[in-house]
Swiss-Prot record:
Manganese or magnesium. Binds 1 divalent metal ion per monomer in the absence of substrate. May bind a second metal ion after substrate binding. Its main location: cytoplasm. One of its GO terms (molecular function) is manganese ion binding. Keywords: Cytoplasm, Endonuclease, Hydrolase, Manganese, Metal-binding, Nuclease. It is found in: Cytoplasm. It is an enzyme of class 3 (hydrolase). This is Ribonuclease HII. It comes from Chlamydia trachomatis serovar L2 (strain ATCC VR-902B / DSM 19102 / 434/Bu). Belongs to the RNase HII family. Endonuclease that specifically degrades the RNA of RNA-DNA hybrids. It holds the Pfam family RNase_HII. GO terms for cellular component: cytoplasm; ribonuclease H2 complex. PROSITE patterns: RNASE_H_2 (PS51975). It catalyses: Endonucleolytic cleavage to 5'-phosphomonoester.
Length: 217
């Protein structure tokens, strides 16, 4: 585990894009990221986050690099801090099937930005170009390179995981609480046995195949 000093240095290193935007005259820089592009079931969720200038949040990192316990701690820390501005966007399975996952991801991001308390004047977006009236910068692997995007990734991931745990209560046979809708061996086996439920993405290959095979809830 990294020391407090090491974590503070890492936070500063990953603030380079935010600092550059501030130097260019922007004041409200929001990181934007998504969770749930790849799963076979459940919505796609986006997070947006504006971190207060001059405040260090130790441990902030790409949500995929954190343990569930670390991620939950940071999620609650971000939500409970009145100086942190967080937003979430959720796009349904029906909408994903209607317009495709990439466009649905962009819609979720736009929703997340709109749900912030304040209006950002610059966006740092993980991995894709986001058509928006607010100026933006696409950062490849941004969740590992920008603290604002990393914070947004934590918010999106934790929020979506909570949604998937709720779907598990409704459809426990699929194990949504464990794999969160991703195509694990156990999920594929359940899909083969039970067929898709209303929360499965019918435009995704394994789900589409099970429908063609006539396996339905």
């Amino acid at each position: 585990m990294k020391s407090t000093v090491e974590q503070a240095m890492l936070f500063e290193e990953k603030s380079i894009f935010e600092n550059q935007a501030i130097e260019q005259g922007y004041s409200q820089v929001a990181g934007v990221d998504e969770a749930g592009r790849g799963p076979l079931a459940g919505p796609v969720v986006a997070g947006a986050c504006i971190l207060p200038r001059g405040k260090v949040f130790l441990g902030i990192d790409d949500s995929k690099k954190l343990t569930p316990k670390q991620r939950r701690y940071l999620y609650e820390l971000l939500l409970e801090d009145p100086e942190v501005d967080c937003g979430v966007g959720v796009i349904s399975v029906e909408r994903i099937d209607e317009i495709n996952i990439l466009e649905a991801t962009k819609e979720a991001m736009v929703q997340a930005i709109a749900s912030l308390r304040s209006t950002p004047d610059f966006l740092l977006v993980d991995g894709l170009f986001l058509p928006h009236k607010i100026p933006s910068l696409k950062i490849i692997k941004g969740d590992a390179r920008s603290v604002s995007i990393a914070a947004a990734s934590i918010i999106a991931k934790e929020y979506r995981d909570e949604l998937m745990r709720k779907l598990h209560v409704e459809y426990p046979e699929y194990g949504f609480d464990k794999h969160k809708g991703y195509g694990t061996a156990a999920h594929l086996q359940a899909l083969k046995h039970f067929g898709p439920c209303v929360y499965h993405r019918k435009s995704f290959s394994p789900v589409k195949e099970s429908i063609q095979e006539g396996v339905c809830q």
